[in-house]
Regions:
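CheY-like receiver
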Residues: 67-75, 113, 198, 226, ...
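C-terminal substrate-binding subdomain of Rossmann-fold SDR/epimerase-dehydratase oxidoreductases
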Residues: 9, 33, 199-330
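Tryptophan-centric aromatic hotspots in well-structured domains and transmembrane helices
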Residues: 26-29, 99, 165, 186-187, ...
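The catalytic Tyr-centered alpha-helix of NAD(P)H-dependent dehydrogenases
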Residues: 143, 147-154, 184, 188-192, ...
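Activation loop
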Residues: 88, 128-131, 135, 191, ...
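Hydrophobic alpha-helix immediately C-terminal to the catalytic Tyr-X-X-X-Lys motif of short-chain
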Residues: 157-165, 195, 253, 257
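N-terminal Rossmann-like NAD(P)+-binding domain of SDR-like oxidoreductases, especially those catalyzing
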Residues: 1-181, 315
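Residues in well-ordered alpha-helical elements
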Residues: 66, 78, 90, 97, ...
Length: 330
């Protein structure tokens, strides 16, 4: 469609997979990635820097705000997709202000500036299923919001800001609230790549609470397809859940991953205490995006985990000494 897409948080694994998907499927004029850090090495960048029609810029949304605005005014993207966030609920109980600084304040400041420009067609915010809290049924977009961590609360704050500026100031926005995504190139503190890392290096995965918590998972390419559909077809102002039909316990995720590796489950993990604020179940009703935009989950567990294991085996030597704990960056 010859649009220019700009992806904030474009150096992360989901931003990279979205960029690749748009280049392959959306006929873009250009896809621009923007991140607070330079692109990581090949196991995590997936060669995105070599894609024709892709450019990457290092700009910090909080501390280099003026430089970011200069870039936006230079490129004048038709569509901005925002993945940029402090994104780990488990560590958000300390330095909680850092999560609000990025996830709420910096983004609302950016949108105020965008409202002064006339070139933006659509701003797509990537939210989180965590804002619904723990649920006992698949939740729809209009159900009560019950965040259980400072991280989730910071994401809720910006979602509600977007709703208000769309309603009162006609800011052209959409929100996608996806379930947990996974993909090759994902950093090793996430459960699936960390399980693969443990299986390949002989380390043990700390399985918090025995893995009884249930979450919903989709492959990053399924999320990218939802983003493309929203960018092309969604009415402005709409919010969409994006996830599978059923949740999966963390234990089952680890069991499936161990099986894909060919490593016994008992050899790959050890049971540890549950983390503070751990919700028991995330479960989304995605019928709205399915009926309105024709989205559906295409990549099932077997295909997705096979791809993840292939990625891990291909880069074992590069990732074996890579950090497996979340590091909060500025």
């Amino acid at each position: 469609m010859n649009k220019t897409y700009l992806i904030l948080g474009g150096g992360g694994s989901f931003g990279i997979h979205t960029a690749k998907f748009l280049i392959d499927n959306a006929s873009p004029k250009k896809v621009i990635g923007v991140g607070r850090n330079p692109l990581r090495s090949e196991p995590f960048s997936l060669g995105i820097q070599n894609e024709k029609g892709f450019e990457y810029f290092t700009r910090h949304i909080t501390y280099e705000f003026d430089l970011l605005l200069e870039l936006l005014d230079q490129e004048k993207p038709d569509i901005i997709i925002n993945f940029a966030a402090q994104g780990e609920g488990a560590v958000s109980w300390r330095n909680s202000w850092r999560f609000f600084e990025t996830n709420s304040m910096a983004l609302s400041r950016l949108c105020e500036e965008l409202m002064k420009r006339n070139w933006l067609e659509r701003f797509i915010q990537i939210g989180t299923s965590e804002m619904y809290g723990s649920v006992n049924h698949p939740v729809k977009e209009d159900e009560p919001i019950k965040p259980s961590s400072p991280y989730a609360a910071s994401k809720v704050a910006f979602d509600l800001y977007l709703v208000s500026v769309f309603k009162n100031l006609s800011f052209p926005m959409n929100v996608i609230r996806p379930s947990n995504a996974y993909c090759p190139g994902q950093l090793l503190h996430r459960v699936i790549p960390r399980t693969i890392w443990c299986g390949l290096t002989g380390n043990k995965l700390p399985l918090q609470g025995g893995g009884k918590a249930e979450k919903s998972y989709i492959h990053a390419r399924d999320l990218a397809r939802a983003i493309m559909l929203v960018s092309q077809e969604a009415p402005l102002g709409e919010i969409y859940n994006v996830g599978p039909k059923e949740p999966t316990s963390i234990r089952e995720v680890v069991e499936r991953t161990a099986s894909a590796l060919g490593v016994p489950f008992a050899e790959i993990c050890e049971i540890t205490e549950d983390r503070i604020g751990q919700d028991s179940r995330y479960w989304l009703d995605s019928s709205k995006i399915e009926s309105q935009l024709g989205w559906s989950q295409l990549i099932e567990w077997d295909e997705g985990l096979k791809e993840m294991v292939q990625w891990g085996r291909s880069y074992t030597s590069q990732i074996k000494n890579y950090p497996t704990e979340y590091v909060m960056r500025g």
